[in-house]
Amino acid sequence: MHLFFAHILAVSIVVRITDSCAATSGTTTTTIAPTTCTTCTTDLIGIVTGNDGDMTPTSAITADANGCSVITYTCERTPVVATDVVLITFYSDSQNPTDVGTENGVGTANVVMNCVNGQWVKEGIVINDVECQIIT
């Protein structure tokens, strides 16, 4: 009789352990990038021209690890001249003064912006225009 109770106890422990590992829900959760961080286009950024040394920068839109859009503007002469001083100035219509920052380099310069709420943003500021200048 003692063996019978030991067997029942062992079976109930196995059932309890197995039951605690059983799935309680058939649903899965998938994280999707918010659409407001994937809707930005190059049309949202104007290119400033007309000043000495102005060139048209190239741009490329990619996605970050969260699936949100990222744009990189590159300023350089074609072919690249390694001794050129290159400036990319970025502007915001919501700031005064509107020129809110500059990236610079020798031969080439880049500025990277993130798509946030359908607008291109750099360092928390919405960017509306970029200017590429090459100083020889």
Swiss-Prot record:
InterPro entries xref list: C6_domain (IPR002601)
A Pfam family that the UniProt record links to this protein: C6
PANTHER family tied to this protein: C6 DOMAIN-CONTAINING PROTEIN (PTHR21629:SF10)
Record protein name field: Uncharacterized protein R07B1.6
Organism from which the protein derives: Caenorhabditis elegans
Taxonomic placement: Eukaryota, Metazoa, Ecdysozoa, Nematoda, Chromadorea
